[in-house]
């Protein structure tokens, strides 16, 4: 029962998904819209509750057991609690019951997002430029014909795609566009076919119950 | 230490320092760099330009804070273009962590326009000229659902208004009333728009993506599934150039300002790779 | 130089520097910033799920407008929380099965249409494809190159036979196209990563320190 019911459900739900695309008839669309608009939307919201519950449990557990770096978990919980209170009671557009400004100092949820989430996330990715430069210098070696081709194509794109491409030759940007439009498309398209066939095969395996990793461990 | 050893073992701090220098100096001492638009960006610009009065444009701001630097200038350029030419525009995000960036872009451009507006007609009025639909999960719901009814999916907009009570939404009901959707993203979302909304409802999809996805997206541009394509900061700079050249819209051009830094940084990376390989060849020859 | 007096700009900048300090090595400032990020990002998420999904889509219609059909998604959704009750935790598989099943079901025809049929149409040698390049007679040449390139690339990824003879030749040609594609992707990736660094510096040097405009 613990496996049969979920496997039957995934088969039925998968079939409904396929049918919705193959038979776009209005009489069926009513049901399809209900599945998408009501069922899937609500399920996605509860999935977030599960994810959040897991995150908080991990950090409470870390504090309780005083695991390595447990002090930082307090920071996470305080930041989460503070921003959730501001968002839930202060409203999405600072329209809630909780005041979200003291004088000219605002602390509504959008302000927190713009001044904490954005700078932190963008800084994490800004680091990648340094690591990429260092890795390219250390690891990019012309050992074979394939590596040479890759390097030449990369250099042409790096130079030709920028304004300096025109300074070198007025034909260079056009040549870069040709590389992207013709040989690049041929190579990428072969990969697109491979990915698409892989997606279809995996989806079929999931719906037909051949792929069961999503059931997780246990009975 | 032999020459080839020196060439192959430059300290990472030197590499970081050089990179930081070549990126920073052109920002502090800027000079004008002429950006020439390429055809994929021109096609996108034309498609947005061709939106007729009876139709609206959807701007999907599904880019995360991590890639803000690359994609936000695209959102601002497209919004400036659409507002300047008085297109009706709907803005949305497909993921919750991205909706704050859409809010930021809209607030910035609306403020730019309204600070220069002389009359009520000139001003950008919420509900009349643009609607911020906000976000509804999971992405498949708006992608397919808006083909039937936009206000059924976005029952309330970002600000909590009932969407069907907004003036603009009286005429904009579903994809039949949309000329093009411009998907700005750092992931495979534009392909999902094609797979769901275009296949089923024939929606035209234009794309602005991070440079990481650029080469992967060309097969979809070549088939016409993507009406136009803006790739990375350079693509954003090209769109900024088109908006200013065609409509004289003045405003800070963040992507264009970055072109010189980008140029020097590319040259530095090429140099690093060349130096590493010279060391590698000398080493191989000795062996 | 015109340093910002906005306290939020200072907070953003200090948090940014804490993350960038990872370049030196992992340190407590980086770890603190990382945890603050996770906390605030999840607080933001909760806000929107409550105000824009659960309230207008579920609770208000169900409890205020009496749309009783919503009891079904509500009940199935609640099953997600059984994950925290070991004795009945298997019930979490029910909402996952419905969600994942429908999604994968829709994905199959959509993928076949968008990524296989349309891509094949863009590859075959037809007059429409020749003209789509807007390059006159060269359009035929470009289409032929794409056609040959796609076939050869596919043959490179065909591992059911040894790459000898005809397949050996086509797979060698295929790898040329793949490598050009990867090269273009690498070139663009460099641009992407540098752009993100520029964005960060534009903020630190401009909005914070006021060194640049």
What is the predicted role of each segment?
Chain B
Residues 127-216:
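Membrane-proximal low-complexity regions enriched in glycine and acidic/polar residues
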Residues 7-8, 273-287:
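Juxtamembrane interface at the cytosolic side of transmembrane helices
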Residues 13-28:
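Hydrophobic membrane-insertion alpha-helices, especially the h-region
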Residues 5-15, 261:
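N-terminal membrane topogenic signal
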Residues 66-131:
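Membrane-embedded segments
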Residues 33-50:
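Alpha-helical transmembrane signal-anchor/signal-peptide segments
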Residues 225-228, 232-263:
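Short, aromatic-rich amphipathic segments at membrane interfaces
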Residues 45-73:
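Short extracytoplasmic
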């Amino acid at each position: 029962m613990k496996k049969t019911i979920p496997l039957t459900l995934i088969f039925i739900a998968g079939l409904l998904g396929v049918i919705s695309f193959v038979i776009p008839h209005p009489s069926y669309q009513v049901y399809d819209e209900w599945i998408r608009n009501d069922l899937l939307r609500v399920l996605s919201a509860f999935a977030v509750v599960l994810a959040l519950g897991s995150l908080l449990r991990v950090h409470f557990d870390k504090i309780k057991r005083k695991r390595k770096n447990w002090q930082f978990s307090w920071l996470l919980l305080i930041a989460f609690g503070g921003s959730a209170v501001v968002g839930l009671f202060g409203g999405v557009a600072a329209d809630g019951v909780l005041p979200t400004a003291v004088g000219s100092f605002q602390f509504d949820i959008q302000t927190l997002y713009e001044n904490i989430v954005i700078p932190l996330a963008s800084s994490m990715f800004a680091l990648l430029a340094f690591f990429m430069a260092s890795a390219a210098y250390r690891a990019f070696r012309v050992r074979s014909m394939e590596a040479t081709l890759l390097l030449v194509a990369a250099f042409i794109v790096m130079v030709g795609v920028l304004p300096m491409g025109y300074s070198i030759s007025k034909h260079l940007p056009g040549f870069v566009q040709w590389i992207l439009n013709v040989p690049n498309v041929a190579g990428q398209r072969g990969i697109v076919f491979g990915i698409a066939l892989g997606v279809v095969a995996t989806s079929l395996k999931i719906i037909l119950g051949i792929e069961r990793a999503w059931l997780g461990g246990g009975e | 230490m032999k020459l080839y050893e020196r060439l192959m073992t430059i300290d990472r701090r030197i590499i970081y320092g050089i990179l930081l220098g070549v990126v920073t100096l052109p920002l502090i001492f800027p000079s004008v760099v002429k950006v020439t638009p390429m055809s994929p960006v021109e096609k996108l610009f034309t498609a947005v330009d061709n939106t007729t009065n009876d139709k609206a444009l959807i701007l999907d701001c599904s880019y995360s804070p991590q890639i803000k630097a690359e994609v936000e200038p695209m959102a601002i350029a497209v919004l400036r273009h659409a507002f300047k030419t008085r297109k009706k525009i709907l803005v949305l995000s497909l993921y919750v962590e991205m909706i704050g960036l859409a809010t930021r872009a809209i607030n910035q451009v609306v403020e730019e326009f309204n600070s220069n507006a002389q009359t009520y007609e000139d001003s950008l009025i919420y509900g009349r000229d643009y609607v911020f639909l906000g976000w509804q999960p999971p992405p498949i719901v708006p992608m397919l659902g808006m083909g039937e009814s936009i206000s059924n999916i976005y029952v309330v907009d970002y600000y909590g208004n009932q969407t069907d009570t907004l003036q603009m939404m009286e005429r904009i009901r579903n994809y039949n009333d949309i000329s093009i959707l411009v998907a700005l993203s750092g992931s495979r979302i534009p392909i999902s728009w094609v797979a769901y909304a275009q296949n089923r409802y024939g929606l035209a999809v234009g794309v602005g993506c991070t440079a990481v996805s650029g080469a992967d997206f060309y097969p979809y541009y070549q088939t016409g599934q993507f009406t136009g394509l803006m790739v990375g900061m350079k693509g954003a700079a090209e769109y900024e150039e088109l908006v200013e050249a065609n409509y004289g819209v003045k405003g800070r051009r963040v992507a264009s300002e970055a072109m010189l830094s980008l140029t020097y940084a590319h040259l530095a990376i090429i140099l690093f790779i060349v130096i590493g390989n010279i060391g590698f060849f000398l080493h191989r020859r000795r062996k | 130089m015109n340093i910002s007096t906005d306290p939020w700009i200072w907070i953003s900048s200090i948090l940014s520097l804490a993350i960038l300090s990872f370049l030196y090595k992992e340190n407590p400032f980086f770890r603190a910033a990382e945890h603050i990020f996770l906390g605030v990002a999840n607080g933001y998420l909760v806000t929107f799920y409550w105000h824009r999904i659960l309230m207008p889509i579920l609770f208000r219609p169900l409890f205020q407008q009496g749309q009783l059909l919503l009891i079904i998604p509500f009940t199935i959704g609640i099953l997600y929380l059984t994950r925290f009750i070991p004795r009945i935790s298997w019930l979490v598989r029910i909402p996952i099965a419905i969600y994942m099943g429908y999604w994968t079901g829709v994905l199959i025809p959509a993928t076949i249409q968008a990524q296989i049929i349309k891509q094949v149409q863009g590859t075959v040698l037809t007059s429409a494809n020749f003209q789509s390049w807007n390059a006159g007679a060269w359009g035929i040449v470009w289409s032929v190159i794409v056609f040959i390139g796609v076939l050869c690339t596919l043959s490179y990824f065909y591992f059911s036979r040894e790459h000898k003879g005809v397949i050996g030749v086509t797979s060698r040609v295929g790898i040329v196209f793949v490598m050009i594609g990867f090269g273009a992707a690498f070139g663009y990736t460099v641009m992407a990563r540098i752009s993100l660094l520029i964005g960060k510096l534009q903020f630190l040097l401009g909005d914070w320190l006021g060194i640049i405009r």
